[in-house]
Amino acid sequence: METDYDIIVAGAGIAGMIAASSASIYSKQNLKILVVDRNTQPEAGKKTINGWVCGDAVGKNSVDYMTERIGITWNKPEIEHPVKGVVAYSPDHETPVYFDGEGYILNRRLLPQKQLKDAEKVGIEFRWNVALRGVYT
């Protein structure tokens, strides 16, 4: 097993996959990149242990930025439909937080699989079932 990487990303969720893909794209695939995740490959992007996940909705400006500046594209079916705002609730389900503006609702089952396929195409490697407890340099 390879143990020497330029970049190691902890977590194959939306943010981790964007970080790894961005690094690969900006380096023109010249970096050796590893993504580790506690889940199995079919469970990539699975909700966190406590059941909460951020990322079911995303702003249009974020998707536009990824498309135009990084080269990451999401379309249907990963993007289910556009929205003109969302309401998020605090963990106790009592306090609403309103977000106005154009955005999209994401398909959290299909998006991680698309991100994996795109990442593998540019040479990003993965290790699954890894419980990361610390980082040593």
For the regions a protein language model found, what residue spans apply to each?
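Flexible, glycine-rich phosphate/dinucleotide-binding loops
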Residues: 16, 42, 95
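N-terminal FAD cofactor-binding segment of flavoenzymes
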Residues: 22, 26, 38-86
